[in-house]
Amino acid sequence: RLNIYTIARIVCFKDPILAAARPELALTKPDGKPVTDANGLAWVNPYRQEVWEYLTELAEMAADLGFDEIQYDYVRFPVGSDANVADYGVDMDAYPKRQAIQDFLAYAGDRLHEKGCVVTADVFGTIIGSETDVQTVGQDYMALGQTVDAISPMVYPSHYANGVFGLKVPDANPYETVLAAMQGSVEELQEIPEAERAVVRPWLQAFTATWVPGHISYNGTQIREQIQAVYDAGYEEWILWNATNRYSAEGLLGADEVEDNENNQ
């Protein structure tokens, strides 16, 4: 009625609640202890069909409540020393990580499409053009680009190591970083027929990454630069991320509006 498009974000395999309630679904180390991230939060096993069903049923509930889209986040394998020694319970040479992630999203997508719901996957921006990152987290950009309806690479400049894209500090170069990342996306997905290709809707940085050496403050200017980079790469959609949900309205103004505001100050 109000022309608002609703998206339900569901965190997938980093799930300490499910891991505690169903320990047999938790991803474990050889000593039987759960695999946890840097904050001590447990992960469940992305190979387990019971986990797929749980995540699909959660999404179906959201669809029944009226959400237009399901956005699966943390739809990947964990990283770190714990993850490297985890017991996944399968022959990972015969069934690699990337296939498990693709199979889960196809499984959930089939069910959710029956309810008329759009299915989106959040992925690391660094998987674009990096086979090493693909193998680590199990997110294959090209494969997922023809599995889900929309794909959202997290191309936050702060998440690229200094020197990437030939930039001394990517975080200090928001336009150049996002443009390079999105041009990489265009190149990687170009062989997929347009009718079969996912919509690309990148996550953009709406926060200041104080932990990055050489970082800059992110305000309206930096947000607008990233948005322009998306457009200049040939894409039309984008979303912003700030973990505290504090967003700068200035970043959403058009060039004419910014100029008017500056003239009125």
Describe each model-derived feature in a short phrase.
Residues 13-64, 224:
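Active-site-adjacent "subsite" loops/lids of carbohydrate-active enzymes
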Residues 148-159, 171-265:
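Substrate-binding cleft of secreted/luminal carbohydrate-active enzymes
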Residues 40-76, 136, 140-147, 229:
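An active-site-proximal structural segment forming one wall of the substrate-binding cleft
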Residues 15-38, 78-92, 139, 172:
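Aromatic- and acidic-residue-enriched segments that line the glycan-binding/catalytic groove
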Residues 39-53, 90-99, 166-175, 213-217:
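The substrate-binding groove and active-site-proximal loops of carbohydrate-active enzymes
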Residues 1-11, 80-119:
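Aromatic-lined substrate-binding rim segments of carbohydrate-active enzymes
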Residues 1-34, 69-72, 114-116:
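Glycine-rich, aromatic-flanked loop segments that form ligand/cofactor-binding clefts
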Residues 11-15, 75-77, 124-128, 156-158, ...:
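Active-site beta-loop-alpha junctions enriched in small/polar residues
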